[in-house]
Amino acid sequence: MAERILLVRLSAMGDIVFASPLVAAFCRRYPDASISWLVAEPFADLLACDPMIDEVIILPTRLWGRLLRERRYLALAREVRAFVTGLRRHRFDLAVDLQGLIKSGIWVGLSGASRRIGLGSREGSQHFMHRVIDRNGGRRERIASEYLFLAEQLGLPVDDFSMRVAVSPEAAA
């Protein structure tokens, strides 16, 4: 059976790019895997054209923020519930929190994944994880070394661990 893997890094453009080598590493380790990435709306375009990502799941933060500002709490609750239901339908085998914050940890927990791993979990997000990998295990002299360290800890191939951002043919022209 193919692995269904969810990566969660909701925001921070640079960190999303720094974490991008993990997608290829997971694909090399699990060639039949389905890779999904949960990301906040403003950053979805960074991942949308990556051919190795099967699905970019967009956290509808703008809609939820508008409903909250308009004090439409029941509509907000319905939207959040529908989103969680849709997320769980994927039946993820593995969810990895690349952000380590409570907001990303909650989504990893709500994903219903049978295995949940957090990178440097803090703010209480470790309570949603089965395993936490120390963010400081990487080489501090190398920027974003925590993602390389995470890959090594998960037994992923790291021989080619280079950052990549896929762009649409229109954007490349």
Question: Which residues does each predicted region cover?
Answer:
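Catalytic machinery of carbohydrate-active enzymes
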Residues: 1-173
